[in-house]
Amino acid sequence: MSNVDPFLLYGTRETEAKPTHLKAGLLSLDLNDGNLRTITYDGVEVLRAVSYLVRDRDWGTYNPQIHDLNVEQSDSGFIVTYQARCEGPDATKLTIDVCIQAKSGGTLTFDAVANTATGFETNRCGFCILHPIVGVAGSPVRVEHVDGTLDRTQLPYLIEPWQPFKDMRAITHEAMPGVTAECRMEGDTFEMEDQRNWSDASYKTYVRPLALPWPYQIEASKPQHQRIVLNISDTRKAALQAGMNAEPVSITLGNTSGKLPNIGIIITPEEAKASLAAIDLLQEIDPQDLLFQYDPMAGHNGSAFADFATLAAKHSARVSLEIALPCEKSLIEETTAIASDMKAAGFNPDAVIVSPAIDRQSTPPGSEWPTCPPLEDVYAAARAAFPNARLGGGMLSYFTELNRKCVPGELVDFVTHCTNPIVHAADDLSVMQTLEALPFITRSVRAVYGDKPYRIGPSTIPMRQNPYGSRTMENPNGKRIAMANRDPRHNGKFAESFALAYAISVLNAGLDSLTLSALTGPFGLTAGEGEPTLAGGKRPLFTTIKTLSGLAGKDWWQLISSRPDHVLAFATEHEFWLVNITSQPQTVSIAQFAKITLDPYAVQNLKRS
């Protein structure tokens, strides 16, 4: 167990509730806040999660109060019962009565009945099932539909922008040779989305098709009954009985290599003056890219460019400008007006990334696309207004939006997007598991855009903009909240670990540039009041950003981890770089180092012999 102060790791003294581990024969799982995580059979993950979730009109997830929780574990299995209670706007209330049980034969059921005396508004209410992606992506599945028909197909390997399967009643996959897992969903119609779009490490099967209207009302005094049944079929002659957690994590040299990307820093008009005041810190990091943001619909105007020009003059780096184009007047009128303000301020970026502001809002399946000028016209106007700058295209939001609305890559000089790890879940495990999805994201981008120069960022733990609702979530008390515009873990060692692991996870993409932080503010590298680092000091994330900036352009070599869910690594010419992405110490074996111990969320470099 770790004795490290949680405040240093997470930026908050609030710790996550320890899950209750339950077993039924070879089936085991964690019960956490009334939902199920890490459902394994004979040590192999079968399902990542089964949860009963209630979403508000902005797709925020309610955190229900759990009452009358009763857990009974026996030699033959377990049974869990409780009541969950949600309180919505205007004194509306919803209760969910739950019974979860499993027997040693390999069957798990999760039964839930929702009821409301007041009526209750929701975007979605019911079960969500997560299948893992590593070792499962691209594998065969059998899908049973609500009309009884069967499809023998496969899970998508490249990320599917729309639902791969609809009108679902059950899905069956092979968990390991000789073991199949059928997940049966009763009580409503289910469909699957490829959650890798949002960098979630899962395929998500959820209740109620997105093509139906939302939000909708759950009517008073009309109970809604849903049930999930997991059936394991094991035809093997013997169990694995593998002690995969007992051995040290083994790190071995792989056979791929490349060049480390440039590192960028994002600077907004709101943080420009603070960034100027922290110019010494910027020069210490010495990033290769400065990425400036300009959004007229957020109140930005030409006055921002004077600060941008001063910053650009004080630090020798490539300069790029994100423009969220309102598209409310003629495109050429808007772009030339921005170009005129830039010229007046003496701000001459090397590249501009122009995207219609409306494209930052998601268009979910079944929804009507908003009015937007053709991207060909947007890019033509940008070329005319900024003839001496490289033109970037893509999305100022996330990969999801780029995957659903591919840009004409032949018209731009590079493609770009961001990611965010707290779109759907904000617990520590889910955030770190998003790293598994990153290689799938970059492969999917490369499949469309080939060897086009490719940039990612800004990608940070806190969310800078919410494409899926009307706002990002305020987080004044420093909790772990999905879609929050501040996250306490950004201030602790967790973010230092996450950022290096992020960079490792996208090495194979051959990125031109990677931006993982701002310089100041809630997305930045300087500490505020009440953080693990004294106010004005350097957050732990600073160390990773400075390290990556110092390594930019250098050769890297692949290192293969026997437990990539615990430790990730890469090599440079003279060093091994290791990162522990868990809350527990990890023992590692690598090259001449027989056994070394990495503290929770620790980053360590070792000299190669």
Curated annotation (Swiss-Prot):
E.C. code: 3.1.1.115
Segments forming a coiled coil: none
Pathway assigned to this chain's UniProt record: Carbohydrate metabolism
GO MF entries: hydrolase activity
Annotated catalysed reactions: D-apionolactone + H2O = D-apionate + H(+)
Claim: ATP-binding is one of the keywords in the record: no
Protein name: D-apionate lactonase
Functional note: Involved in catabolism of D-apiose. Hydrolyzes D-apionolactone to D-apionate.
Record keywords, A-Z: Carbohydrate metabolism, Hydrolase
